[in-house]
């Protein structure tokens, strides 16, 4: 059976169908339980981070190396010809891509990954472009939800915090809309979910509602997806008010569903009290670890045409 993801660019989560998402998740599950240490032997993956990253960069490098591949690239664009000598992004991409079998890019500019894809004939993977998209984070989020809930369909999912600039919630809401989930958006008015996401949900007939506090909906949830409210976007007084309104404490989880899982793309700052860590609902550290398997699955499918026959 031909692999529909072979040599495909992954720029937006919207580039993937429900069937393709399910293929990635089953492949991730297979790789988590059945490692393939030589699957990417002799493959070279370019990893280019024009923006700071910890979890994405390290889990991606780990994913490649545990599949037997080699990583080239940089985590500080300030030391590259693009920054030091004025080379264009297009020229940088063309040259780096000529050394590799796939190109993973994180960039602060929205649309940078799609631009990169125009200048190379190898698969380009978007590792985050500005406040736009973060599709590989979405894949690990979906894998974690599937792993903990045993399904993706018809779940009650709340998104909390910075829903305007948080690229992780944009991608995840779009992906989960393929599975007819119910959404609860909890954010300060200045950081509400963008209109274009709401319009997409309306077009698909997806149920969603807007709330001012976690307590309003937490007892009805299957997944509580927390995000960081960015302090730099508010004055100190306003930030302190917002921070306290969107803080999750363990005592707020006393009457929740047994299957509830609290997720967070990390890093967390003030939005999840450490007393939540010891509850059975906290799953954000396992979620981060799942990034290895989700990214392994994506690489396996992009670079090996018949891997799904083994999954």
From Swiss-Prot:
<keyword id="KW-0808">Transferase</keyword>
<dbReference type="Pfam" id="PF00185">
    <property type="entry name" value="OTCace"/>
</dbReference>
<dbReference type="InterPro" id="IPR002082">
    <property type="entry name" value="Asp_carbamoyltransf"/>
</dbReference>
<dbReference type="InterPro" id="IPR006130">
    <property type="entry name" value="Asp/Orn_carbamoylTrfase"/>
</dbReference>
<comment type="function">
    <text>Catalyzes the condensation of carbamoyl phosphate and aspartate to form carbamoyl aspartate and inorganic phosphate, the committed step in the de novo pyrimidine nucleotide biosynthesis pathway.</text>
</comment>
<feature type="binding site">
    <location>
        <position position="228"/>
    </location>
    <ligand>
        <name>L-aspartate</name>
    </ligand>
</feature>
<feature type="binding site">
    <location>
        <position position="106"/>
    </location>
    <ligand>
        <name>carbamoyl phosphate</name>
    </ligand>
</feature>
<protein>
    <recommendedName>
        <fullName>Aspartate carbamoyltransferase catalytic subunit</fullName>
        <ecNumber>2.1.3.2</ecNumber>
    </recommendedName>
</protein>
<feature type="binding site">
    <location>
        <position position="56"/>
    </location>
    <ligand>
        <name>carbamoyl phosphate</name>
    </ligand>
</feature>
<dbReference type="Pfam" id="PF02729">
    <property type="entry name" value="OTCace_N"/>
</dbReference>
<dbReference type="InterPro" id="IPR006131">
    <property type="entry name" value="Asp_carbamoyltransf_Asp/Orn-bd"/>
</dbReference>
<feature type="binding site">
    <location>
        <position position="134"/>
    </location>
    <ligand>
        <name>carbamoyl phosphate</name>
    </ligand>
</feature>
<comment type="subunit">
    <text>Heterododecamer (2C3:3R2) of six catalytic PyrB chains organized as two trimers (C3), and six regulatory PyrI chains organized as three dimers (R2).</text>
</comment>
<keyword id="KW-0665">Pyrimidine biosynthesis</keyword>
<dbReference type="GO" id="GO:0005829">
    <property type="term" value="C:cytosol"/>
</dbReference>
<feature type="binding site">
    <location>
        <position position="266"/>
    </location>
    <ligand>
        <name>carbamoyl phosphate</name>
    </ligand>
</feature>
<dbReference type="InterPro" id="IPR036901">
    <property type="entry name" value="Asp/Orn_carbamoylTrfase_sf"/>
</dbReference>
<dbReference type="GO" id="GO:0006520">
    <property type="term" value="P:amino acid metabolic process"/>
</dbReference>
<dbReference type="GO" id="GO:0006207">
    <property type="term" value="P:'de novo' pyrimidine nucleobase biosynthetic process"/>
</dbReference>
<feature type="binding site">
    <location>
        <position position="85"/>
    </location>
    <ligand>
        <name>L-aspartate</name>
    </ligand>
</feature>
<dbReference type="GO" id="GO:0004070">
    <property type="term" value="F:aspartate carbamoyltransferase activity"/>
</dbReference>
<feature type="binding site">
    <location>
        <position position="267"/>
    </location>
    <ligand>
        <name>carbamoyl phosphate</name>
    </ligand>
</feature>
<dbReference type="InterPro" id="IPR006132">
    <property type="entry name" value="Asp/Orn_carbamoyltranf_P-bd"/>
</dbReference>
<feature type="binding site">
    <location>
        <position position="137"/>
    </location>
    <ligand>
        <name>carbamoyl phosphate</name>
    </ligand>
</feature>
<feature type="binding site">
    <location>
        <position position="55"/>
    </location>
    <ligand>
        <name>carbamoyl phosphate</name>
    </ligand>
</feature>
<dbReference type="GO" id="GO:0016597">
    <property type="term" value="F:amino acid binding"/>
</dbReference>
<comment type="similarity">
    <text>Belongs to the aspartate/ornithine carbamoyltransferase superfamily. ATCase family.</text>
</comment>
<comment type="pathway">
    <text>Pyrimidine metabolism; UMP biosynthesis via de novo pathway; (S)-dihydroorotate from bicarbonate: step 2/3.</text>
</comment>
<dbReference type="GO" id="GO:0044205">
    <property type="term" value="P:'de novo' UMP biosynthetic process"/>
</dbReference>
<feature type="binding site">
    <location>
        <position position="167"/>
    </location>
    <ligand>
        <name>L-aspartate</name>
    </ligand>
</feature>
